[in-house]
Structures are given as C-alpha cells and as structure tokens.
Design a protein with these regions (language model features):
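Arginine residue identity/basic-tract feature
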Residues: 9, 19, 32, 121-123
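Rossmann-like adenosine-cofactor binding region
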Residues: 17-90
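Short, charged, surface-exposed secondary-structure boundary motifs
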Residues: 3-7, 53, 100-103
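Adenosine-phosphate binding glycine-rich loop
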Residues: 66, 70-128
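NAD(P)-binding Rossmann-fold cofactor-contacting core
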Residues: 1-16
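Short, hinge-like loop/turn segments at secondary-structure boundaries
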Residues: 10-14, 38, 108-111
Length: 128
C-alpha cells in the first residue's frame, strides 16, 4: 500500500488537476469511493485466475463510471463481467499491452510496426 500511495502522490504532484485515491483492496476501501468515482482501475493480478472481486458491488459505481482492468488474460475478468452486467463501460489491458509492444518495437528498430499486426498476433496467442 505504501508504494501505491507514493505513486499516487507523485502523479498528483505533477498534475495538480488530477485527484487520485489509493484504497485497500476490500469492500470497505473500494466501496466507499464507488458512488463518486469516475474510473475504477485494477492494477493487481486479482482476476487472472478467473476469480476475484466477489465482494465488490460494482453497481454502486456512479452512472457513467468506467472500469479498466489491466489484466489481459482472461480478456473478460470477473471485474469486467461485473462492469458489463451493470452497464458500465469497461476495457481490459490488451490495448495497453499492444501500445507498449508497438512503442518498444519502434525504440528497438527505429521503425513503426505495421498497423494492427501486434494486436492481431497477441489475440491469436491469447486464444490458444
């Protein structure tokens, strides 16, 4: 939790208009902020095994609130299933992973990868 709080403070120091909260990963910590949150982001490995967040009532998230789970396998984590069933916009970590791969490719080779190639290949690998 201390590391997360340091990172949060660092972002808010750099971007004064941004308000972030670091909370314990439990119903009391997360649940307290859902009614006022614009975005819920999971950066943990919870959900990778197909279970997790049983305690979270994502329907308490304010209307228009979005859910992002950095996990990319499975593509629809328990958290994202909850978001979907509650009607909240959601996304997984595939887009971020692809963007990081494309940037790394550019840095290593000095060239841009062909559009869509990495995403197509990643999806094929994840579907195996």
């Amino acid at each position: 939790m201390e590391k997360a709080e340091l990172l949060t403070r660092g972002v808010m120091d750099k971007y004064a208009q941004v308000r972030l909260s670091t909370v314990p990963l439990n119903s009391a910590g997360v649940g307290r902020y859902l009614p006022i949150a614009d975005l819920v982001v999971n950066t943990t490995s919870v959900g990778m095994g197909g279970s997790g967040f049983d305690w979270l009532d994502i329907s308490a998230l304010q209307k228009g609130g979005k859910v992002y789970d950095m996990v990319y396998s499975p593509p629809l984590t328990p958290l994202l299933v909850k978001a979907k069933s509650s009607g909240h916009p959601y996304a997984n970590g595939i887009g971020m992973l692809v963007a990081q791969g494309e940037e790394a490719f550019s840095l290593w080779t000095g060239e841009q990868p062909p559009p869509g190639v990495m995403k197509t290949r990643l999806r094929a690998l994840l579907d195996k």
